[in-house]
């Protein structure tokens, strides 16, 4: 009888990173959620949505020969750059590669599978086991099989000090922390885990808007680079009505010579749709909440959360754009 991988277990957000008694914590990786299974030599590598990804990541298929037969792992596909940072953009660029192109990409930007859960072991369904038992069995697989790249064992801890240390790893691409109850079973498609995503508050310059200046829907943000050029760094989520009304009185339509004249902006990361924007004078500083994910150009990959306008700050006081 063919074993079908279950839907992945999911997580719900937490407002803070406190590790509670009876729970374990793991780093949250900036990659692609994936399930990998091997059964009688047949390897399956599926995305969170059930898409087969093995043709794009042949090194995972080759490495699966070192796993016990009739075994399945839950984890995250990641790519590290030469500096040891997670390179999400390179990971995503590999999705469309096939055949020789996928092989070249595997050599240039090898993917790793960071395993954080065990769903099946040598034909035994382990999803009904408590997390602590699944975790111990997963560690035993890595030890007994002496697994190395492309396999990586995700750290797990019950020590709050270790969690605090992980939260300082944002610069290398750790998105936050996942929390799992030690006695919890693996529940497909259920948000039984908890997650805390690292976000930082920072400043940027409001340089354009979507919608109208009387009622902006989103604000496009910039920062000056080391040569004094205003670079696009990201855009906000939709401000609240109160925030929108406050911002409206602080925006000045752009005069001639705006540095973004003639530019177009994508409606979303990876989207070909462009935004209909109105340029404004790059004078107003905004305080925003952003997470750690950046693209290769140094832009925020996810929308920034509007906190407040900072008319008390000059654009020259905003952190410099870093690519």
Where are these regions (language model features)?
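Catalytic cores of nucleic-acid ligases and guanylyltransferases
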Residues: 1-323
